[in-house]
């Protein structure tokens, strides 16, 4: 593809990010490509994704310089603008970022020359019984991270609304949508519905709905399953539930998951990819489902998700297995697979080149 406008989202607390940003700006200047910093905390206020991408000139490529948290900020903007997102890895335990800082110029050249794989990632969105907002006076108490809160989500004007179906909100999540308790001494009580049917009522510290991409984030820390990012699923996981059934449930992509705050519960916070977006009172609900749009992530080649899982999670082998030495690939990659395996995803063989997907 031909890149004409680049948006930069960077981790301001890392010197490496500033160095990488100068390299990106220099690359853009040499090729006459418009480059704009997207400062999500300019003027000490947060802006909607639509305002941020408009201020940056509606970039067709967003480059994030940081770890997975920075990538999530960039993904929110890319989803709004249907842009590509390229993650430059300056973090420590990242699954989302793709390129080491030293290779950022080579990565930009690969994008410009269309020598990339475009990986389509599932996103979540939601409907709610009412507009989400943070009550006056509660923002300072609930402020997440170092900067101010995002503005309340806008109502989607392209979707029908009604008393039964609630209102559709301009929200996209690459990792997860979480409903969590506000009071330290009181769990949140929530009825959980899958595909419109009550699964169970929970008292828990939090309840979350994750994408396969988000299965290695908060959901993983809460005991949820690791799911291939190429899969299509919604993953429901309770966090510290006060009940015997504490398992995750993996739903099909067309099965929405609704969370209703019960009358005996206190208020509950709604966070989207770690960003506080509103507070629900007893009787309120949110319905989480697969978003119609997808994230378009730049990959320079096939992603070795399971190799990265082993590396980033520091997975170790059982003592009995260590004696066998370093594990080799199950199947050789020196020749083409036989016909009965040709439809499977296997390690790349000789001469394989990335293609858009």
UniProtKB/Swiss-Prot annotation:
Record keywords: ATP-binding, Cytoplasm, Kinase, NAD, NADP, Nucleotide-binding, Transferase
Superkingdom of origin: Bacteria
Binding site for NAD(+): 68-69, 73, 175-176, 186, 205, 240, 275
Pfam families to which the protein is assigned, alphabetical: NAD_kinase, NAD_kinase_C
Family: Belongs to the NAD kinase family.
Catalytic residues (positions): 68 (proton acceptor)
Needed cofactors: a divalent metal cation
Enzyme Commission (EC) number: 2.7.1.23
Biological process (GO), any one: NAD metabolic process
One annotated GO molecular function: ATP binding
Protein name: NAD kinase 1
Compartments, record wording: Cytoplasm
GO CC terms: cytoplasm
Keyword Protein biosynthesis: no
Catalysis performed (reactions): NAD(+) + ATP = ADP + NADP(+) + H(+)
Job description of the protein: Involved in the regulation of the intracellular balance of NAD and NADP, and is a key enzyme in the biosynthesis of NADP. Catalyzes specifically the phosphorylation on 2'-hydroxyl of the adenosine moiety of NAD to yield NADP.
Transmembrane segments: none
InterPro entries registered for this protein in UniProt: ATP-NAD_kinase_N (IPR017438), ATP-NAD_kinase_PpnK-typ_C (IPR017437), NAD/diacylglycerol_kinase_sf (IPR016064), NADK (IPR002504)
